[in-house]
């Protein structure tokens, strides 16, 4: 069948319906506006609704001025500070004390919360207990913990004394002076004592004329022998050296020079520096033996020196005999005894003045200690020493041999 290619004409008026006034195009547009709305109407409606809702919103208050806010903050701070000061007003801790410590001149009482009167009161009541204020630690303490004399607590006082007081040195004890020296009894050399005498000139070391009498100017011109260290075997060797020789060939051993106090000689041992002492021979053995003392050391030689073995005892018929000492051990501090068989004592040096003659004398010098002893002899003589031991000298007027007795001396 044949199709009609022409499109039928549509009548809009019949489809939509008649509209009063205007053409068909205008009527069709009005019908669409009622159902869908035009774009212009949408914009107008939105603008009108926004304008009507704006007055309904609540507007925020305007910001206050800066000056008013700072003044309010300062006022709040002042109020809080005033409350704190009222709560921290210092008051005395003692019960019943209404003292206002804010008026005290010293800040000490405000810091420790005690008035000046109660800080020195013997007994106060704090927290229901009897206490006392300690001025050392600035606290209240019970009466049992307090020292009434010192006005301080005992615990604080003990610590204060320990910090302030220096330790006192132990009293001088001769046993502790030579703690480094052990073993058998010995003599010890002290160069710090004798160095002064060794360096002194002959003019400075002259003894008074009434104390020392020099019989020969060249009595100390010969070479000196070394000193003996009296310790162990050295003591036995010393016993064999120090004896009285002569034509009679008699030997007097010194028991204080031997370790076992025996009479026999022992094997020889080296010679060392020793504590100074002097042995003076008798008048009988002048030509065979002599001993010397110089600068705090002992020197001895035995036999064969007849031309130099000068007597150290005076042959003067006066009632005193004196020992010649070339140099003193110390520059001063001497004590000199009177005449007539008295004693002569010097600091660090001891020797004898004896009545009569032809008497064996033993003199010794030693380091000064705190004690001094004097021993009378049969010839009304005295041996005064400053040291650790002494020797008793006894002799008969008719005999030239003198027995020498040794007393025990301290060993360290």
UniProtKB/Swiss-Prot annotation:
Induction: Negatively regulated by microRNAs miR156b and miR156h. It comes from the Eukaryota. Zn(2+) 1 binds at residues 92, 97, 115, 118. Residues 48-57, 67-81 have a biased composition (Low complexity). Keywords: DNA-binding, Metal-binding, Nucleus, Transcription, Transcription regulation, Zinc, Zinc-finger. Residues 1-81 are annotated as: Disordered. A motif (Bipartite nuclear localization signal) lies at residues 150-166. Pfam families: SBP (PF03110). One of its GO terms (molecular function) is DNA binding. Its main location: nucleus. It is found in: Nucleus. Zn(2+) 2 binds at residues 134, 137, 141, 153. Expressed in stems, leaf sheaths, and young panicles. One of its GO terms (cellular component) is nucleus. The keyword ATP-binding does not apply. A zinc finger (SBP-type) spans 89-167. Residues 18-31 have a biased composition (Gly residues). Trans-acting factor that binds specifically to the consensus nucleotide sequence 5'-TNCGTACAA-3'. May be involved in panicle development. The SBP-type zinc finger is required for the binding to DNA. This is Squamosa promoter-binding-like protein 2. It comes from Oryza sativa subsp. japonica. The gene is SPL2.
């Amino acid at each position: 069948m044949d199709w009609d290619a022409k499109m039928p004409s549509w009548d809009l008026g019949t489809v939509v319906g008649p509209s009063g006034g205007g053409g068909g195009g205008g009527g069709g547009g009005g019908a669409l506006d009622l159902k869908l709305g035009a774009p212009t109407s949408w914009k107008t409606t939105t603008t009108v609704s926004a304008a009507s809702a704006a007055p309904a919103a609540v507007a925020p208050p305007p910001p206050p001025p800066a000056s008013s806010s700072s003044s309010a903050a300062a006022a709040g701070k002042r109020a809080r500070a005033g409350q704190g000061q009222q709560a921290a007003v210092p008051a005395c801790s003692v019960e019943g004390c209404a003292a206002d410590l804010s008026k005290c001149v010293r800040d000490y009482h405000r810091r420790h919360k005690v008035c000046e009167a109660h800080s020195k009161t013997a007994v106060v009541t704090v927290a229901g207990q009897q206490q006392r204020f300690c001025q050392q630690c600035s606290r209240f303490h019970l009466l049992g913990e307090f020292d009434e004399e010192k006005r301080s607590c005992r615990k604080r006082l003990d610590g204060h004394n320990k910090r302030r007081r220096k330790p006192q040195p132990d009293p001088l004890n001769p046993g502790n002076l030579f703690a480094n020296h052990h073993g058998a009894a010995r003599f010890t050399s002290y160069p710090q004592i004798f160095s002064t005498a060794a360096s002194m000139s002959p003019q400075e070391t002259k003894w008074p004329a009434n104390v020392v009498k020099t019989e020969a100017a060249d009595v100390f011109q010969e070479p000196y022998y070394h000193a003996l260290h009296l310790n162990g075997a050295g003591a036995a060797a010393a016993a064999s050296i120090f004896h009285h020789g002569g034509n009679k060939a008699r030997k007097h051993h010194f028991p204080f020079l031997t370790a076992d106090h025996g009479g026999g000689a022992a094997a020889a041992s080296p010679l060392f520096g020793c504590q100074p002492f002097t042995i003076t021979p008798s008048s009988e053995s002048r030509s065979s033996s002599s001993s010397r003392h110089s600068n705090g050391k002992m020197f001895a030689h035995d036999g064969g020196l007849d031309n130099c073995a000068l007597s150290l005892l005076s042959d003067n018929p006066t009632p005193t005999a004196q020992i010649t000492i070339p140099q003193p051990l110390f520059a001063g501090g001497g004590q000199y005894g009177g005449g007539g068989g008295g004693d002569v004592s010097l600091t660090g040096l001891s020797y004898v003045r004896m009545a009569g003659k032809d008497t064996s004398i033993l003199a010794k010098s030693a380091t000064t200690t705190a004690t001094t002893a004097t021993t009378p002899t049969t010839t009304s003589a005295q041996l005064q020493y400053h040291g650790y031991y002494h020797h008793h000298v006894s002799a008969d007027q008719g005999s030239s041999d003198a027995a020498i007795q040794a007393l025990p001396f301290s060993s360290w």
